[in-house]
A protein has these predicted regions:
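Alpha-helix-loop-beta-strand connector modules within alpha/beta enzyme cores
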Residues: 1-23, 69-86
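Long, charged amphipathic helices and adjacent flexible linkers at domain junctions
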Residues: 12, 72-127
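Hydrophobic faces of well-ordered beta-strands that scaffold small-molecule active sites
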Residues: 17-21, 45, 52-54, 162
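Catalytic cores of alpha/beta
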Residues: 25-47
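C-terminal helical cap(s) of enzyme catalytic domains, especially alpha/beta-barrels
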Residues: 58-81, 229-234
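Nucleotide-binding motor/catalytic cores of P-loop/tubulin-like NTPases across gene-expression machines
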Residues: 149-151, 157-195
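C-terminal binding/interaction regions
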Residues: 201, 207-223, 228-234
Length: 236
């Protein structure tokens, strides 16, 4: 319960959450984790952690590569199930499905209100997230100098993958910790058209986009003292 509370508070105050210490401790010597350890990793992800970290398992353990692979497998399996349930839940909210929501009872409630975030930014991210879900967008793109808007999007735990665009190297590194956010560097002072062109080229080259896919972009155009006040839909 304490872990869940700490994660919830960190989300509210825009702090990335890393769950660590003895998560797969038995794998220092064993080639397989215990069921309890597997459950611990899965629960950390379902609680809303941005990352899980290994320590002794890789520092002094007998199977460092194997333990990293095991944590990756547990994380991917858990996230896959989580995102499938989120998609079903969003479909129900948007009236796309008549399936009951009982199966989604275990899902953590997304932390939508982020402490200290500009209210315009918060409202635009909220609305754009719903648009992305309703239009089955392929990517949700956030242009952010500080990375705070990417955190706000991350806390939605949306099923649409998020791309964080920034020209700041420090922000680029920070965004690697944000749940569901893939950081991508862009040229300095790029305008909206340049951002769309850059992310479209990146997506096509990396197999993340195809012609005809939709992108939802959240960016600022100078209104509201740092607030991100613009959301737009772009078709590749």
């Amino acid at each position: 319960m304490v872990q869940k509370q700490i994660i919830r508070v960190c989300q509210q105050y825009q702090k990335p959450v890393i769950v660590a210490t003895q998560m797969l401790d038995s794998m220092q010597y064993s080639r397989r984790p215990t069921r309890a350890e597997t459950t611990d990793v899965a629960n950390a992800i379902l609680d809303g952690a941005d990352a899980c970290m290994l320590s002794g398992e890789t520092a002094i353990g007998d199977h460092p590569r194997r333990v990293v692979e095991m944590m990756r497998r547990i994380a991917q399996s858990t996230e896959r199930q989580y995102l499938n349930s989120r998609r079903q839940y969003l479909d129900e909210l948007l009236g796309k499905s008549r399936i009951g929501a009982a199966g989604n009872a275990y899902l953590p409630k997304p932390q939508r209100l982020v402490h200290g975030l500009h209210p315009i930014t918060q409202a635009v991210v909220e609305g754009a997230s719903r648009v992305a879900a309703e239009l089955d967008a392929r990517l949700f793109v956030v242009a952010s100098k500080s990375g705070v808007t990417a955190i706000a999007r991350s806390k939605h735990r949306g099923a649409v993958p998020t791309i964080g665009l920034t020209d700041d190297p420090a922000t680029l590194r920070q965004m690697t910790l944000y749940w569901g956010v893939t950081p991508v560097a862009v040229p300095e002072e790029a305008d909206v058209n340049q951002l769309l062109s850059h992310v479209s080229d990146w997506g096509l080259q990396n197999g993340r986009l195809e012609r005809g896919d939709r992108i939802v972009l959240v960016a600022g155009i100078g209104f509201g003292a740092g607030g991100h006040n613009m959301a737009m839909v772009h078709e590749v």
